Amino acid sequence: MAPQEDPEDHVAPAAQRVRAGTLLLANTDLLEPTFRRSVIYIVEHNDGGTLGVVLNRPSETAVHNVLPQWAKLAAKPKTMFIGGPVKRDAALCLATLRVGADPGGVSGLRHVAGRIVMVDLDADPDLIAPLVEGVRIFAGYSGWTIGQLEGEIERDDWIVLSALPSDVLVPPRADLWGRTLRRQPWPLSLLATHPIDVSRN
């Protein structure tokens, strides 16, 4: 049976400000290797600062080699992703809930935004499995202190956009950076044509 569709998977409203569930896309002038063409999903944004994970930086480390109990639920390519430069020795897990799934009463899940939840890696994967389309596990995260991210946005380092529930589990070959820009209105969508190798421009 085909999976039930969610209208949110096709249309993301424009993001007016940074909040949990929004995306930060590296602008074309942000050439620092850690964040170049990165797409960051914001997990927390509050008075304590901002925390997010890079969605498009897969590592070569298989989930099975680090957290074997979660390997079955891990979305393809079933590798750990580099969430950012902070605490690379710590793991953080996000999941996309199935359409209509009710996580109420299930320990180990914390709502982030829409159908995205944070998963406690000490939870029982067998209890989580019926509720989610898959999980993505990140080594480390990206963090900003109070006001730091706002300054970077004012400097045009980042573009703030709304996320689709499917963005969290997109495989690396899909070019999430370009795909996210292409679904934006003109002229923002034109940035998707920016060459990966700027020396070719």
Curated annotation (Swiss-Prot):
Entry GO CC: cytosol
One Pfam family cited in the UniProt record for this chain: DUF179
Domain of life: Bacteria
SUPFAM superfamilies tied to this protein: VC0467-like
InterPro entries: AlgH-like
UniProt cross-references to NCBIfam families, sorted A to Z: PRK00228.2-1, PRK00228.2-4
Family note: Belongs to the UPF0301 (AlgH) family.
Entry protein name: UPF0301 protein MMAR_0053
Provenance organism: Mycobacterium marinum (strain ATCC BAA-535 / M)
